[in-house]
């Protein structure tokens, strides 16, 4: 069972915290992680790109000049792709990029992502993280205590004051535990999470 330090927001160690083997101590499956991240990024795409083909561009119904005798290359339409304002060859059209991810694969990927953070010593467990009012200085001070720059902060529930405190800090994102995903966990160098949020994760994935 992985054991990590338990800290307060000032960066002082207040004890040890045991993590579930079933969630934070599994073998990292890089293949599944890759598949899930590719699917997540694909699902974020709008797919609204659109350009006109030569059939859709207005004009160009008349041959621009006669076939022979002008000395110029033969042309059939001013809306052919080689012309300025002509149509696009194989023009992109709106499409759905979404990819379905099986629940079992999501679970394996989430456990692998969390376990990788433990193995790479990139996880920080906080005793608690509260704020009566938005105070960016407090979050900056906490990040400095853990030498954290590109950081994901995870709380048990949505906390407006914590969110407002961190939203102007470059490279820092605050999420409630219900909103975390594999991509967000892996793309940040430091994963700071409250012990109550850890308990929620273990309830779902253990």
Curated annotation (Swiss-Prot):
GO annotations of cellular component type: ribonucleoprotein complex; ribosome
Protein's UniProt keywords contain Transit peptide: no
One MF term in the entry's GO annotations: rRNA binding
Keywords: Ribonucleoprotein, Ribosomal protein, RNA-binding, rRNA-binding
Pfam families xref list: Ribosomal_L4
Chain segments carrying region Disordered: 44-76
Keyword GTP-binding applies: no
Family annotation (InterPro entries): Ribosomal_uL4 (IPR002136), Ribosomal_uL4-like (IPR013005), Ribosomal_uL4_dom_sf (IPR023574)
GO biological process: translation
NCBIfam families (alphabetical): rplD_bact
Protein family: Belongs to the universal ribosomal protein uL4 family.
Subunit record text: Part of the 50S ribosomal subunit.
Chain's role: One of the primary rRNA binding proteins, this protein initially binds near the 5'-end of the 23S rRNA. It is important during the early stages of 50S assembly. It makes multiple contacts with different domains of the 23S rRNA in the assembled 50S subunit and ribosome.
Stated name of the protein: Large ribosomal subunit protein uL4
Biological source species: Clostridium tetani (strain Massachusetts / E88)
Gene for this chain: rplD
């Amino acid at each position: 069972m992985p054991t990590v330090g338990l800290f307060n927001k000032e960066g002082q160690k207040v004890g040890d915290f045991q993590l579930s083997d079933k969630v934070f101590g599994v073998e990292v499956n890089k293949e599944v992680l890759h598949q899930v991240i590719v699917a997540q990024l694909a699902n974020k795409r709008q797919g609204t790109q659109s350009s006109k083909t030569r059939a859709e561009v207005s004009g160009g119904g008349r041959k621009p000049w006669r076939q022979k005798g002008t000395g110029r290359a033969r042309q059939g339409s001013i809306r052919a792709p080689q012309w300025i304002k002509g149509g696009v060859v194989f023009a992109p059209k709106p499409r759905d990029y979404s990819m379905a991810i099986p629940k079992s694969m999501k679970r394996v990927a989430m456990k692998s992502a969390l376990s990788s953070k433990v193995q790479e010593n990139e996880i920080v467990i906080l005793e608690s993280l509260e704020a009566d009012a938005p105070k960016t200085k407090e979050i900056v001070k906490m990040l400095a205590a853990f030498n954290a720059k590109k950081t994901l902060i995870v709380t048990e529930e949505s906390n407006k004051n914590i969110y407002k405190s961190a939203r102007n800090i470059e490279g820092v994102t605050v999420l409630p535990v219900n909103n975390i995903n594999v991509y967000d966990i892996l793309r940040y160098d430091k994963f700071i999470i409250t012990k109550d949020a850890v308990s929620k994760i273990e309830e779902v994935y253990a």
